[in-house]
Amino acid sequence: MFNLMANCCNWLKRWREPARKVTLVMVGLDNAGKTATVRGIQGESPLDVAPTVGFSKVDLKQGKFEVTIFDLGGGKRIRGIWKNYYSESYGVVFVVDSSDVQRIQETRDTMAEVLRHPRIAGKPVLVLANKQDQDGAMAEADIIETLSLEKLVNENKCLCQIEPCSAVLGYGKKVDKSIKNGLNWLLNNIAKDYEAISERVQKDTAEQKAQEEQDKKERAERVRRIREERDRQEREEAEREGRTLKEEELDDVNMFNPFQPINNVLTENQDRLNREKEMQRQRENGQQGSVQEQIALQDEEEEEEDEESERQTPESTESGAVDQTKKKTRKLRLKRKHRVDPLRMEEAAPKSPTPPPLPVGWATPKVSRLPKLEPLGDTRHSDFYGKPLPPVAIRQRPNSDTHDVIS
């Protein structure tokens, strides 16, 4: 009775515990089946999977765990980024292509490099011997012997479990049982030492962030030194040639961090374009104002000439007839102030008149129509039915008797 009550209390305690967050990294050579395995666990079809470029992140719920799996690409050029994910991982899933015997040595070297990393050593490792459904696939014992798996895990003090499986045989609830059993084993071992592993993950993550900040500062310092050396060389070369060098004032922030966010760059470009447009508008307004001033001056000069011509005309004292004949006729002029000035200089340029559109059917060849065909002979007898038929000419025919003629 006492044991039953203790078991019930333990069950209630576990049931009330919050879900634990666990991060796993899935690594292995390219074409080993990592993405197919993740999709099968997630409940998606593992068929027609494209190679992973970089990494992909998958979140899923597994029992009392909220699992985040980082599926890392296995190409040679991408394996260098694996170490950036080791610090926040609670465990490792290493996928092996058991049917690719030619690359088994490369698999061994890669696995040894992963397990010997200081941020992976001591963490539980699950090895999935994938593609067991293909012909020529290596057995579990052969893989352990070829990879020297027992030696590697003992040297790095890692708990290890190997599961032969095939990721393409099912997904979701029908996923390969070996994959499901291996994942449960990995999560259970993490749960047994969750506090220690979580503390180690937090410590490694903080150290990695500090290291990244230090590397960032060192890169910025190297860039600054390179710029200073280049400016010094340009200044010395300008002094030797006897020319002055215009030094640009650089922002302290840009000197400290040469890599600026794209939003800042876009904002600066937009401001520069706005300034250029404003300067262009001011230049156009200045040109238009100068043209208007010239037109006003010309109008004033013409008015003064007209007034002088009127004053210089002598007053006539002769008779009205002579005055009318000698009166000076004023020449009509079109003053500039009566003209309509264009708003812009571009519109003032005369435009060549566009020819009107050609009429419909222009240049269409004329069709020479044939005359109407008429029947041969004269069929138009208007008085044919109004007159009697002409008499038939009687021709003499011989009778049976000689020289007898019927009249």
UniProtKB/Swiss-Prot annotation:
| Residue positions binding GTP | 28-35, 71-75, 130-133
Tissue expression:
Cilium-specific.
Its placement in the membrane is given as: Lipid-anchor
The Acidic residues compositionally biased stretches are 298-309
Q: Where is the composition biased (Basic residues)?
A: 327-339
Q: What is the effect of changing residue 28 to V?
A: Abolishes ability to rescue a arl13b mutant when transfected, without affecting localization to cilium
S-palmitoyl cysteine lipid sites: 8-9
SMART domains under this entry?
A: ARF (SM00177), SAR (SM00178)
Family matches, as Pfam families: Arf
Q: Where in the cell is it found?
A: Cell projection, Cilium membrane
Q: Which GO terms describe its molecular function?
A: GTP binding; GTPase activity
- As recorded in UniProt, coiled-coil segments are 195-313
Compositionally biased, Basic and acidic residues: which spans? 202-247, 269-284, 340-349, 371-384, 398-407
Instruction: Give a yes or no for keyword Cell membrane in this entry.
Output: yes
InterPro entries to which the protein is assigned, alphabetical: Ciliary_GTPase (IPR051995), P-loop_NTPase (IPR027417), Small_GTP-bd (IPR005225), Small_GTPase_ARF/SAR (IPR006689)
GO CC terms, sorted: ciliary membrane; cilium; motile cilium; non-motile cilium
> Where in the sequence does UniProt note compositional bias of the Polar residues kind?
285-295
Q: Where is this region: Disordered?
A: 202-407
Keyword Transmembrane part of the UniProt annotation = no
Regarding protein family, the annotation reads: Belongs to the small GTPase superfamily. Arf family.
Give the protein's function. Answer: Cilium-specific protein required to control the microtubule-based, ciliary axoneme structure. May act by maintaining the association between IFT subcomplexes A and B. Binds GTP but is not able to hydrolyze it; the GTPase activity remains unclear. Required to pattern the neural tube. Involved in cerebral cortex development: required for the initial formation of a polarized radial glial scaffold, the first step in the construction of the cerebral cortex, by regulating ciliary signaling.
Q: How does it assemble?
A: Interacts with EXOC2; regulates ARL13B localization to the cilium membrane.
The protein's matches in NCBIfam families, at most eight in alphabetical order, are given as:
small_GTP
* Protein name (record): ADP-ribosylation factor-like protein 13B
